[in-house]
Regions:
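Phosphodiester-processing cores and adjacent nucleic acid-binding clamps
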Residues: 1-281
Length: 281
């Protein structure tokens, strides 16, 4: 309406105080005006129940519960997310997973502290032995589930703390130390997104996810986005070989910002064209 030039005066539309409302009803009897403005409005207020639409979670994300297909029980979201991610990762990159993939998944699911805590437990090892055992343990701890990860980090925090931690202090420190999709409580949100995208894809509609989701390798492995945020690389759909470096040992991502721009290459094992992937996000 403000775009219409014939409007010359605009009525006051602000929320009025009680006194202003009584003044606006001054053409009525004083007692009747008071009843309309004060008494009746309070009667309506008393008839309205207070409900908490979104529970107060103290500043942390509100994580809804996700029902299973039978509509009766609820999904164990951390378990489902972990299974989806590692099933797809193994299908693309093989089993065991390359160290770089294992580390990326661990960081995106729970933060850096999981691998840090494992290396602390293996401080007597060094070199290649430390590397092999660290990533083996990282995989085992995460695949065993959320409780396994929490116990691992909880133990590390307790052993490395400079002060004595009671149970409450330890849990607060654990909560502050963990990050990532599951560690920060975003797993139900990701699972809901995965279901929405899958339903859309099943109906024949492509969903193009970008932004923060497009840069999440976990989201890629869950099928939420078609964007692979890893650096440019080749991967074989048959033997699961992945190549992130050229013949001289230089990262392919240093030359190619997008894996789609990589030159065609044949798998040395299967002699079929390698898939070109990775958008370095």
């Amino acid at each position: 309406p403000l775009a219409k030039k014939d409007i010359t005066s605009i009525p006051s539309q602000h929320f009025r105080t009680t006194e202003e409302m009584l003044n606006d009803f001054s053409f009525l009897d004083k007692d009747l005006a008071y009843k309309i403005v004060v008494e009746n409005t309070n009667k309506v207020l008393d008839m309205v129940d207070e409900i908490e639409v979104i529970p107060d979670t103290g500043g942390t994300p509100f994580s809804p519960r996700v029902k299973s297909d039978d509509e009766k029980s609820y999904l164990d979201c951390p378990r489902v997310v972990t299974d989806l991610v590692y099933t797809k990762a193994k299908d693309w990159y093989g089993d065991p997973l390359p160290y770089s993939i294992e580390e990326r998944l661990g960081t995106e699911l729970y933060g850096d502290i999981v691998l840090t805590s494992i290396k602390y437990d293996l401080k007597d090892l060094e070199g290649e032995e430390l590397k092999v055992e660290s990533f083996k343990r990282l995989h085992e701890v995460i695949v065993n589930g959320r409780d396994s990860v929490f116990n691992q980090v909880r133990k590390y925090l307790k052993e490395t703390s400079e002060e004595e931690l009671d149970d409450d202090s330890l849990e607060k420190k654990l909560k502050a130390s963990l990050g990532g999709v599951i560690g920060a409580g975003f797993d139900p949100i990701y699972l809901i997104a995965q279901r929405l995208v899958k339903h859309s894809n099943d109906e024949g509609y492509l969903v193009g996810s970008r932004g923060s989701v497009g840069s999440s390798f976990v989201a890629t492995m869950m099928g939420i986005t078609e964007v692979n945020p890893l650096s440019a690389h080749y991967r074989c759909s048959k033997c699961k070989l992945s190549i992130f470096e050229d013949e001289d040992g230089n990262p392919l991502g240093a030359t190619y910002s997008s894996g789609f721009d990589l030159p065609d290459k044949e798998c040395p094992n299967c002699h079929i064209p390698l898939l070109k992937d990775g958008q370095d996000m």
